Each structure stands twice: as C-alpha cells, then as structure tokens.
Amino acid sequence: MGEGSRRPSGMLMSVDLEPVQLVGPDGTPTAERRYHRDLPEETLRWLYEMMVVTRELDTEFVNLQRQGELALYTPCRGQEAAQVGAAACLRKTDWLFPQYRELGVYLVRGIPPGHVGVAWRGTWHGGLQFTTKCCAPMSVPIGTQTLHAVGAAMAAQRLDEDSVTVAFLGDGATSEGDVHEALNFAAVFTTPCVFYVQNNQWAISMPVSRQTAAPSIAHKAIGYGMPGIRVDGNDVLACYAVMAEAAARARAGDGPTLIEAVTYRLGPHTTADDPTRYRSQEEVDRWATLDPIPRYRTYLQDQGLWSQRLEEQVTARAKHVRSELRDAVFDAPDFDVDEVFTTVYAEITPGLQAQREQLRAELARTD
C-alpha cells in the first residue's frame, strides 16, 4: 500500500438507513445505548441555551435583512440541534470549515454574533476574523470548503498535531465535484477529517431525492472507503455523540467519516427565496412537529433539568445577544475599499496597486 495511505482495520462497509437517535420526537429517551453519553447537567442545559440563542439570533438576522441592513441572509431555523450538537463536542483547537448556514456552529465556537453580522454586511474582511477561533470564513461557493478542510487535516498530520478538521456542508453540496475530490483524497490519505452533511431535504428548490440514486447520502461513504453514518439531525444529543465518535476516530489516526444529519430547513433557502413555489405547507407543518427545541426542552423536563427559572435565564440571554447583534451591525464602520487589495497577499502586488488606483479614481469621479 502506498506511503501515507494506511487503512484502518475493521472498517465498516455498510450503512444503517435508520438514523442514530437518543431522544425521540416526543422528548423521551430511546433504547439506543451504543451512543449514549453521560454528559454533565451543566452541559445538557448549555446545549439548550445555545439552541435557543441560535434561533433568536437567526430571527434577528432575518429582521435586519428585511430592514435593509443586510443584503442577504441564509436562515437556519430547524437546524439548531444539528449545528449545536456537532460543534459542542469538538476541541477549541479543531478547525471548522463551514458553509453559509452555520450560525449555531459559530456561536458554540465562541465567535461573537457581531462578527457574524458584519461578515454578512460585508464591512469587515468578509469573515476572516473567524480564524482567531480556528474557524474558517463561511464558504458561499458550494462545497469548496471541503477541499480546504482536507488540506488543513493533512497539514495537521505533517505537523503531528492532535487536531481534527470538520467540513460542514449541505445535501446539495454532495453533488459537487469538489466534494468528490475532497472525500476521495481524505480517505486515500487517511486524514483526520470529518464530513458533516446537514441534509435539510432541499438544495434551494432541488429535493434530496434528485441529488443521489444511493439509498442515502451516508451510503456514498462506502465507495470512498470510509465509514458513513446517519443521525437524527433534530436530536442534539445524538448529533453530539455521533460527531464525538467520528472526531475520536480521526484523532486516533483511523481516517475520515461521512456523517449525514437528517434535518429540515423550516425557513427559506435565503431571504431572497420563496419556498412556497416548490414545497407544500403540509410538508413544512409535518417537519415542524419534529422541531428540535421543544423536543429537547421536553427531554430536560423529564430529566428534572428544566425549570421556569432556566427558561427565563435563557430568554434573557437570547434577548441580550440579539441586542448586541443589532448594535454591532448598526455601529459597523464603512468598509475601507483599500482592504479589497491589501488583504490578498502579505505585500500588495503591482497589479493590485494599479487596480486600487483605478477604483479610487472611479470612486472620486462618482462622489
């Protein structure tokens, strides 16, 4: 076998169509024991807080876009458990490579909501400040971040770092050539990388049934020679446990894993989208009954971990961060157009200097 392509022993070459589920739709624990984890009560409550805060901020982002403060936004309503659960189990030194709908991931990683806001507003480096938290800038081109994730994982291998990279992507991205290359390369070179697909059923107006002829997205892992697993993306504890196992596997040198988190986008693809043109209200209502936040609240109640005081504290926290977001967006300084040219290379090139002067002249002419 070629150098750098060690195969882990005992690799599972089958995928269970039934998603891993620890908390049922009614909020009661399931019989699943393999992935069960005894998390501290503080962590269990914190997961709930992060899901609620994510939803509140998501609502505020939509409001800001409707008020003309943001040109566009990609709502994540309904996907809070898939994002919060997956990000919560990772180490702060694990690198994250998100697409454009990962608000819950950013918040769990400790990125201030205002930083996310100005990134969407386009007034501060396009999100490059995320790198202070080991989180790459959000990727708007579909699937390109998966290549970067694999490259970062290979760098960690070469530097003998004890870190894992996670590529966050959607079901639509799995049809992109970049994602194929990333999956293949990651498996061949046994990189410490996890591919986390949030299957929210729709790639804009394209249903997942037209994305693949495979039984599921997770089944694609078999062809690449890596484990694939499906998880209930509306079950925050299941998402936490499945990601934790995949990250531990990668950290141990056993290579990548493809996770399919089965969830649903309750809102539009973006604030410029009208989902009523391609999906029924009946479908949305059906998935709304599986809303991850009420489900997890019921679970906490049954475990004696929820109280009205906790709810009031979480609500107050959510309102506070909403206010912080609005202040950050409204107070954001105007964008310095020079940064378009000065943040590309360590030293600006002659070609970029010429382009900068052309833009300056055009702006002066139109003032």
Swiss-Prot record:
Functional summary from the UniProt entry: Component of the branched-chain alpha-ketoacid dehydrogenase (BCKADH) complex, that catalyzes the overall conversion of branched-chain alpha-ketoacids to acyl-CoA and CO(2).
GO molecular function term, any single one: 3-methyl-2-oxobutanoate dehydrogenase (2-methylpropanoyl-transferring) activity
E.C. numbers: 1.2.4.4
Binding-site list for Mg(2+): 171, 200
UniProt-listed PANTHER family: 2-OXOISOVALERATE DEHYDROGENASE SUBUNIT ALPHA, MITOCHONDRIAL
Metal-binding among keywords: yes
Reaction equations catalysed: N(6)-[(R)-lipoyl]-L-lysyl-[protein] + 3-methyl-2-oxobutanoate + H(+) = N(6)-[(R)-S(8)-2-methylpropanoyldihydrolipoyl]-L-lysyl-[protein] + CO2
Name of the protein described by the UniProt record: 3-methyl-2-oxobutanoate dehydrogenase subunit alpha
Cofactor: Mg(2+); thiamine diphosphate
Keyword field contains Magnesium: yes
One Pfam family cited in the UniProt record for this chain: E1_dh
Superkingdom in the source lineage: Bacteria
Induction, per UniProt: Up-regulated upon nutrient starvation. Is also highly up-regulated in a DlaT-deficient strain. Part of the bkdABC operon.
SUPFAM superfamilies (UniProt xref): Thiamin diphosphate-binding fold (THDP-binding)
UniProt source species: Mycobacterium tuberculosis (strain ATCC 25618 / H37Rv)
Keywords assigned by UniProt, alphabetized: Magnesium, Metal-binding, Oxidoreductase, Thiamine pyrophosphate
